[in-house]
């Protein structure tokens, strides 16, 4: 695939982590991509980070913002999709650091009729604090460094850092929705349009990504495994409020029991607004 890729990075009031994410993306070996920051209501610190990176990046950077009205991950991702120009979208969380071959590997794995679900290594709270405070480029660490951190309890596992040529084994879980998360998920734009993107009835933490994956299955799109190829380093963060999880699970169960393809309230319902991120104070 040679088309432009859109990397849609969701964030909320975590400017130091976003700075590290943009640093990692700036070092990609494949530079034929754009970055869309999908901002779920952050304050001026986030806008300042984005402004500081805009002239330094060798690829376009856009900032899409919506008012803070609680966790609205589905809606802000739809706004990110709407602002994107690529024919292939990679969703990445604003605290996930991509290794230098992340874009190149996703491009190589891209295939018509398939989406790619990657995985992650979780960093501990202490190691995350050190990475951010000392501006450590942890996305460049080799397996030896990661192994030392594993022995110290700094990371939870090593396997996502390995690169293995799995070939046809990447398709053996083609109908499994579990474990496919928007911290590392790649979907063709035409498939997002067919499914109408994320369902914004999902609010609060949880399962809006699973809902999308199930509807992709209903549309005939299958899952390709990005493990041992596209792993990212996921910085620690406190557990999100899960008070809406029960309602979100009920919505997901309904989709699982149906053959519905399109979101109940999705990408096509997004209306362009004049929402602007908070001004950066000079």
Language model features: what each stretch is:
Residues 1-27:
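N-proximal low-complexity "stem/linker" segments adjacent to membrane-targeting elements
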Residues 3-6, 34, 211:
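Cell-envelope/extracellular polymer assembly enzymes that use nucleotide-activated donors
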Residues 22-67:
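Acidic donor-binding segment of Leloir-type glycosyltransferases
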Residues 67-84, 101:
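Glycine-rich, basic loop-to-helix element that forms the pyrophosphate-binding segment
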Residues 89:
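Short aromatic/hydrophobic "clamp" motif used to bind/position activated sugar donors
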Residues 101-150:
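Conserved donor NDP-sugar-binding/catalytic core segment of glycosyltransferases
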Residues 136-177:
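Short, flexible, basic/aromatic active-site loop/helix in glycosyltransferases
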Residues 179-196, 202-222, 227-228:
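A short, conserved alpha-helix in the catalytic core of glycosyltransferases
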């Amino acid at each position: 695939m040679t088309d432009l890729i859109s990397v849609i990075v969701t964030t909320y009031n975590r400017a130091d982590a976003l700075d590290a994410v943009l640093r990692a993306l700036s070092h990609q070996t494949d530079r034929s991509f754009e970055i869309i920051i999908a901002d779920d209501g952050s304050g001026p610190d986030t806008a300042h980070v984005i402004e500081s990176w805009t002239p330094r990046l060798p690829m376009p950077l856009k900032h899409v913002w919506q008012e803070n009205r609680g966790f609205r991950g589905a809606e802000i991702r739809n706004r990110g999709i709407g602002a994107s120009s690529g024919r292939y979208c990679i969703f990445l969380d604003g605290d996930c650091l991509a290794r230098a071959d992340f874009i190149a590997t996703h491009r190589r794995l891209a295939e018509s009729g398939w989406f790619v679900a990657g995985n992650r290594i979780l960093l501990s709270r202490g190691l995350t604090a050190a990475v951010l405070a000392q501006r450590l480029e942890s996305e460049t660490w080799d397996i030896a460094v990661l192994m030392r951190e594993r022995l110290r309890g700094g990371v939870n596992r090593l396997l996502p850092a390995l690169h293995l040529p799995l070939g046809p084994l990447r398709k053996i879980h083609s109908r499994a929705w579990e474990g496919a998360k928007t911290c590392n998920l790649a979907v063709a734009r035409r498939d997002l349009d067919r499914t109408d993107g994320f369902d914004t009835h999902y609010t609060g933490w949880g399962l809006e990504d699973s809902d999308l994956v199930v509807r992709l299955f209903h549309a005939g799109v299958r899952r390709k495994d990005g493990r041992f190829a596209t792993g990212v380093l996921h910085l620690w963060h406190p557990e999100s409020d899960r008070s809406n999880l029960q309602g979100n699970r009920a919505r997901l169960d309904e989709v699982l029991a149906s053959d519905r393809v399109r979101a109940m309230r999705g990408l096509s319902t997004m209306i362009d607004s004049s929402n602007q991120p908070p001004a950066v104070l000079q």
